[in-house]
Design a protein with these regions (language model features):
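Rossmann-like NAD(P)(H) cofactor-binding subdomain of soluble oxidoreductases
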Residues: 1-16
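Interdomain hinge/lid region at the active-site interface
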Residues: 93-162
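Long, positively charged, glycine-interspersed low-complexity recognition regions
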Residues: 164-184
Length: 184
């Protein structure tokens, strides 16, 4: 048994959502079982490399921990932002939709992902997702306090650190124009 997770995709699903270059320069994580044989792992790796993927082999636990931060937590946040928008009266919802900027559009794109798949991910990886939510909540509380204190210096420090992480993601090749993941 040799599970693979191509870390590529969009909020769209089904046969019509396919893109020929979807896996190009994207990571595929292979999490072989303890009984997997090396020649079989190499075959699976070669398959993904042929599709244009970069391949990384890791344990299922390492995969789940990393993805709880890089993928699952952003979905939690996106669903909660949408829920917050929907908590307003209809007129305000319409105004929010009409004047939505890139930030909200990006979050709603993520929140438009396939519900059944995300239900299953949230249930199957619940412990690590809850751990990520706890860390996020702690950081959000700290940010809330900085905002309440009107601590401009601390806000700039937080924003600059965030900017540096973004630069690191770009430098690592994890933000490219191709394939287009619905960001345009």
């Amino acid at each position: 048994w040799i599970p693979s997770h191509p870390v590529a995709g969009t909020e769209k699903s089904g046969p019509t959502a396919g893109q020929e270059n979807l896996f190009e320069n994207r990571w595929t994580i292979i999490t072989p079982s303890k009984n997997a044989k090396e020649p079989d792992i190499k075959k699976v790796s070669l398959f993904w490399e042929t599709m244009g993927s970069k391949v990384k082999i890791m344990s299922p636990d390492e995969h789940d921990k990393i993805l709880s931060i890089t993928s699952h937590l952003p979905h939690v946040v996106a669903y909660n932002i949408v829920k917050t928008v929907m908590g307003h009266d209809k007129k305000m919802q319409n105004d929010i939709i009409q004047y939505s900027a890139g930030g909200l559009r990006d979050f709603t794109r993520i929140a438009a992902s396939e519900p059944t798949m995300w239900r299953d991910i949230f249930i199957d990886n619940s412990d690590l997702i809850i751990e990520a939510i706890d860390k996020f909540s702690k950081n959000l509380d700290e940010l809330k306090k900085v905002i309440a204190d009107k601590d401009g210096k601390k806000l700039i420090e937080i924003f600059n650190k965030s900017k540096e992480l973004r630069k690191s993601i770009i430098k690592a090749g994890q933000e490219t124009d191709k394939p287009d993941f619905g960001r345009k």
